[in-house]
């Protein structure tokens, strides 16, 4: 059971309060043959001094922040970690989240029992204000547009899936779009070899300095991100030769963003 090497890719930026718990959750897995790669994106806090305590058990990569956009920096860090990895099964983890001890073995068993799967999404528990709640999966009224978006730390996949993402230039444009949205969309709308499970395996920490924390609903940046998401979706459908027509949501978003630009100017 523990023969196959499995890679855990951790991305971190200024998570000194949480990064040790994140690392320990990987080291304390009940699956032994792990390759743990952590990319620190030029943290300015004590993150690196904490990470270095475990340098004999981790592969540590230091990376510059090359973009003004946090989502793009995280994407670049993840690509760097992927290039360093050697496992055929890969689990993602943000520096402020953590795994429960049986996560790796449970995910591996799911892939073993379902050989046709490329991606497994596990619905995480949310930790906010010292309280745990389960992430609610919302009903999608237009299933052809927005995927059910599981946070990054709940995404596990075969190596070939991410190689396909790179081949289709999934990460090259739209710097405000997070990695989890891109991976969820590609898996659920394009490749369709995925499974969403509700077992409690991952703790997703909701913090004030997270990538999405500063994007308030219906704010200027919210509409901007939504419009970029629409264009991203159209690009991917086109590249995969899938016919898709712009709908009312797209035009509402485009007009609203245009009006907001007029007001700001």
Residue ranges and their predicted role:
Residues 94-98, 123:
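The conserved acidic donor/metal-binding loop of glycosyltransferases
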Residues 24-33:
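Short, acidic, metal-binding catalytic loop of nucleotide-sugar glycosyltransferases
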Residues 122, 140-217:
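Conserved nucleotide-sugar donor-binding catalytic segment
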């Amino acid at each position: 059971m523990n023969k196959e090497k499995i890679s855990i890719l951790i991305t971190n930026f200024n998570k000194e309060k949480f990064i040790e718990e994140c690392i320990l959750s990987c080291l304390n897995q009940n699956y032994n043959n792990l390759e743990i790669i952590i990319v620190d994106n030029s943290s300015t806090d004590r993150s690196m001094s904490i990470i270095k305590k475990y340098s004999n058990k981790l592969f540590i990569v230091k990376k510059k922040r090359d973009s003004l956009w946090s989502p793009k920096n995280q994407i670049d860090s993840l690509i760097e970690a992927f290039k360093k990895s050697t496992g055929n099964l890969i689990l993602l983890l943000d520096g402020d989240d953590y795994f429960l001890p049986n996560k790796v073995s449970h995910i591996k068993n799911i892939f073993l029992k379902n050989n046709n799967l490329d991606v497994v999404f596990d619905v995480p528990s949310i930790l906010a204000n010292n309280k745990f709640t389960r992430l609610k999966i919302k009903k999608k009224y237009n299933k052809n547009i927005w995927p059910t978006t599981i946070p990054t730390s709940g995404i596990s996949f075969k190596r070939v899936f991410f190689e396909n993402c790179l081949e289709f230039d999934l990460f090259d444009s739209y710097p405000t779009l997070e990695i989890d949205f891109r991976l969820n969309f590609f898996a659920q709308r394009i490749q369709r070899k995925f499974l969403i499970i509700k077992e409690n395996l991952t703790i997703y920490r909701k913090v004030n300095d997270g990538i999405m924390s500063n994007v308030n609903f219906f704010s200027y940046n919210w509409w901007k991100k939504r419009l970029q998401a629409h264009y991203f979706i159209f690009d991917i459908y086109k590249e995969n030769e899938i016919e898709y027509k712009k709908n009312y949501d797209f035009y509402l978003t485009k007009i609203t963003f245009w009006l907001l630009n007029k007001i700001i100017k």
